[in-house]
Each structure stands twice: as C-alpha cells, then as structure tokens.
Amino acid sequence: MFFMRMICNCINSISMKAQKMDKPVFGWRRNGDDLSLSDVHSSIRIKPDASTFRRAMAFFGPGYLVAVGYMDPGNWATSLAGGSKFGYTLLAVALVSNIMAIVLQSLCARLAIASGRDLAQACRDAYPKPVAMVLWLLAEIAIIATDIAEVIGTAIGLNLIFGIPLELGVLITALDVFLILYLQKLGFRWVEALVITLLGVIAVCFAIQLALADPDWGQVILGFAPTTEIVTNPDMLYLALGILGATVMPHNLYLHSGIVQTREIGPTIAEKREALKFATLDSTIALMFALLINASILILAAATFNKTGQTNVAELGEAHSLLAPLLGLAIAPTLFGVALLCCGINSTVTATLAGQIVMEGFLKMRLAPWLRRLITRAIAIVPAAGVTIFYGDSGTGQLLILTQVVLSLQLSFAVFPLVMFTSDKAKMGELRSPLWLSAIAWLIAVVIAALNVKLLMDFMG
C-alpha cells in the first residue's frame, strides 16, 4: 500500500506539473517558453536604478534596424520612378506610408513587450497549423522579395563605385553573411552600431546631393498634400503601392517584434509600460529619419530628372549616369553609389534577422544563421542573376519595382494578425491597444487591403 500510494502521488505530481506547463498565459494556447532570437534575447541589460535618459538610451537601436527596411534599394527604385514621372506628387504617399509605419511598428513593440512573443510565434499560437503554414510561406516570399531588391541594389552599388560587373556583384553579395555573423558574435550592439553608422553616411550623401539639386521647396511642401489622382491614375497607383510596399514592409513587422526583446524587460506592468514608451519613441524617431531619406530620393528625382524632361528614370544605373551632367559636379554620382551600397549592406543585416525570426517563430526550426542566410540569398540570387544576365541594367529597375509591389500585396497577411492580437485584451492584458489606437490600426489595415484589391483589379482589367 505504501508503494502504491507513492506511485499515485508521483503520477498526480507529474499530472499537476503538466497541467501547469500547459496552462495558457492570458489568451494564448501555449506558454511563451520559446525565446525570439534566443542567442541575443535579453542580452542588453537595463539598470533599474539608472537615470531616465540612460534607460531610454538602452532602447535606442532597434528602431534604426527597422528604419533600414524603409530605405532599402527597392525603395530607391520606386522613389526614383515616382519622382521622375510625377514630380513631387507622390511625396504625399511617402508621408502617409510613414505614418502608417509608425503606428504598425508601435504595435509590434506592444505585442513583443506585453506577450513576450514575436509576431511569428503569436501567429503559430493563435491559428490552426494549416493557416500558420500559409502565413509562414507568405512571410518567406516577402523576405525573398526583399532580398532580391537588396541583391540588385548592392550589386549596382558595387558596379557604380568599383566597376564590378553586375553578374559578379550579385554573387559577391552572398559573402555578406560572414560580416553579419562576426558582428553578432561581438554583441547585438555592434550590429546596431554598424547600421546607424551607415545610415549616417547615407544622410550625408543625400544632404549634399539635395544642396546641389536646389529643388523648388514650395512645390516640395505642396507635394505632401494628397490628391485624388493618386488613386484614379493606374500608373500613379502602381507606383504609389510600390512606395507603400517599400515603406511598410511585411518582414519589418516580424523583425521589430523580435529585436525589441534583445532588451532585458522587467516583469511588472510598470516596467513593461516604460519599455513600451521608450521602444515606441525609438522607432518613431528612426522612422521620421527614414522619411527624410525617402523624401530626399523622390525630391532629388523630381528636381533633376522630372524638371529636365527625363520622366522615365527607374534604373539606378541610369540615375547614376544622369546625375553628373544635371548637377554639374563629378562627385554627385559617387555619392549616389556610396549611399546605395550602404543601403544594400544595411538591408542584408536586417533581412537575415527577419528570416531567422520568421523561421524559428513559425516552425520552431533553428538553423545556423549562416545557413539560413545562404538559403535565402541563394533563392534570391537566381531571379536577380537571370535578369542581370539577360536584360542587364535595363531590367533591374523593373524587377526592383515589382518586388515592392509583391511586398505590398503580402502586407495584409502580416498586418491583420498584428492588429487583431494587439486589440485582444485576453492576449495583451493591461497593455492592450487603447480603442483610439486600435481604430486607427484597423483603418490602416483596411486601406492597405483595399488598395491592393484595386491594384489587382487594374491588372486583371
């Protein structure tokens, strides 16, 4: 009887532990035991006794990694095409897209801090496996589309500065994985430092080019006012959606919800509220900086190309060759090439992290970062190499714009789950989005979906 009682007690103990482990947290089906980016999760300490400024600065960084996606080479192509063809008109789209991005990225930080999950983990928990697999596949397609833009942009940058043929440049881009691995080994702050430094170089390059272009600032200001022609003109809508896809990018939503968790966030509601405040401030400032860069590209195209009748400039190489005679200074195209190369390098860093978050979150599959990077890059290199070999520079611009439209079409499949999760009190607890924020987020989600339906109808028509 004694042994029977011991066995029963052991079984009951094991059963109780299993029930405790299976007990969902808030409205989640599983406990959030899987860590996002486990190798760097909570690796940056935040001292509770530090000053408010120091605690805020501890959250400085992730927003700039997110901002990289808002000024990648694909964005350059759409902004150049929009500025050269329609002047300053599409500045309004860049502004509205940036406001949408600020709202959505704040929701990413909210989801991560409140639930301890990134967006991919949240989708795996909330949806049946077939639905989660579809969302995973769409997220991977978005990352590959992003990577195609980065491959082409980096290859063109290498060609413009060093004269390396595009075909060889496409292959060289596969080597960037070693730089990323080295920096991650040093610590996540080193990754952020590289990205922020290159962003500074990009800003200086465009500041000089804008000073040389001398745009009509009155027209620039008017360009930030939306017009109905953006929706009624199919060509303008196509480029507008390209700008939207290049600005509010699906992979960035997964990325931000993961890298915010590199900070050591306390367990109390007060600590989480403070973390959310600082993380939102970080991403908002970074995205305003990204808007300045995006607007600079479009303004440069409008002031140099559209003004002189060059209304069909979509290829980055063509823009590079036209800048010197139009701006009257030999260094102008070099600055353009340097900024493009910096954007390409930065984008590869963030796409690698996003790919890691998506695969681990949806599939619970942990690949070595170098292997994950090479798989994604190998898939992206095939179409990029094919276009550069058979069509040369003339085809790369169109492929870049196409990748951004593909990203725009994928966007709703990341935005709707994000808005649903952050509006759900059962999942978010006291950190659920307030009603006004949820209303704005739902409006953004519906607008994005409606614009994509309009684009598809125009194509089918």
From Swiss-Prot:
Recorded hits in InterPro entries, A to Z, give: NRAMP_fam
Chief location bin: membrane
Cellular component per GO, a single term: plasma membrane
Transmembrane intervals: 56-76, 89-109, 132-152, 160-180, 193-213, 230-250, 285-305, 322-342, 378-398, 399-419, 433-453
- Provide the membrane topology annotation: Multi-pass membrane protein
Q: Where in the cell is it found?
A: Cell inner membrane
Q: Which GO terms describe its biological process?
A: iron ion transmembrane transport
Named from the GO MF annotations, one term is: manganese ion transmembrane transporter activity
What are the coiled-coil residue ranges? none
From what superkingdom does this record's organism come?
Bacteria
Question: What keywords appear on the UniProt entry?
Answer: Cell inner membrane, Cell membrane, Ion transport, Membrane, Symport, Transmembrane, Transmembrane helix, Transport
Recorded hits in NCBIfam families, A to Z, give: nramp (TIGR01197), Nramp_1 (NF037982), PRK00701.1 (NF001923)
Q: Which PANTHER family match?
A: NATURAL RESISTANCE-ASSOCIATED MACROPHAGE PROTEIN 2, SOLUTE CARRIER PROTEIN FAMILY 11 MEMBER
User: What family does the database annotate?
Assistant: Belongs to the NRAMP family.
Function of the protein: H(+)-stimulated, divalent metal cation uptake system.
What's the protein name?
Answer: Divalent metal cation transporter MntH
The species is: Agrobacterium fabrum (strain C58 / ATCC 33970)
Please name the taxonomic classification of the source. Answer: Bacteria, Pseudomonadati, Pseudomonadota, Alphaproteobacteria, Hyphomicrobiales
